[in-house]
C-alpha cells in the first residue's frame, strides 16, 4: 500500500483521487469480508494441483481488479462508460490485481495449513483501512 501511495505521488496521480464520505469506511470493511468470501473462498479452484490453483488465482485476481470501477463506470442516466485513457485507472487496477494475488498468497501460505480465510480477510481489511487513512491524510474524505 505504501508502494502504491508512493507510486501515485511519483507519477503525479495522487491529486486524481476520488473523494469519499467518512461513513464509507463501513462499506470498505464489509467489502473486505464479502470479497474474500467470494474471490478467495468460493471462486478459487482447489484440490487439483498447484498449477490449477495458481492459474485460478491469476484469473480471479484479474476479475477482482476489473470488478472495481476504475476502468469503467455505470450511471443510471448515462449507462456504462469505459475509461481506458486514465493513467490513474490503470495504475489502481494494476495494484488491485497485485493485492488480490497477495490475498491469495495469504490464504494458501504454508503458515496457514488449514487455508483459513481469516488471514486474507484481515489482510484485506488492513489494506482497506490503510487506504482510508491515506485518503483522510490527503484530504479526500468529506466529513
Locate each region found by the language model.
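Loop-to-helix transition at the N-terminal end of transmembrane alpha-helices
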Residues: 14-24
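Catalytic phosphate/metal-binding cores of nucleic-acid and nucleotide-processing enzymes, i.e., regions
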Residues: 8-14
Amino acid at each position: 500500500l505504501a508502494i502504491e501511495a508512493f507510486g501515485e505521488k511519483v507519477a503525479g496521480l495522487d491529486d486524481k483521487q476520488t473523494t469519499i464520505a467518512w461513513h464509507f469506511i463501513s462499506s470498505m470493511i464489509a467489502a473486505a469480508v464479502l470479497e474474500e468470501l467470494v474471490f478467495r473462498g468460493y471462486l478459487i479452484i482447489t484440490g487439483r494441483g498447484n498449477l490449477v490453483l495458481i492459474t485460478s488465482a491469476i484469473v480471479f485476481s484479474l476479475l477482482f481488479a476489473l470488478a472495481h470501477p476504475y476502468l469503467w463506470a455505470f450511471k443510471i442516466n448515462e449507462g456504462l462508460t469505459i475509461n481506458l485513457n486514465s493513467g490513474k485507472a490503470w495504475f489502481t487496477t494494476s495494484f488491485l490485481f497485485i493485492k488480490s494475488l497477495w490475498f491469495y498468497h495469504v490464504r494458501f501460505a504454508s503458515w496457514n495449513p488449514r487455508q483459513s480465510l481469516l488471514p486474507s480477510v484481515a489482510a484485506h481489511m488492513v489494506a482497506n483501512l490503510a487506504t482510508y487513512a491515506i485518503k483522510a491524510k490527503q484530504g479526500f474524505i468529506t466529513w
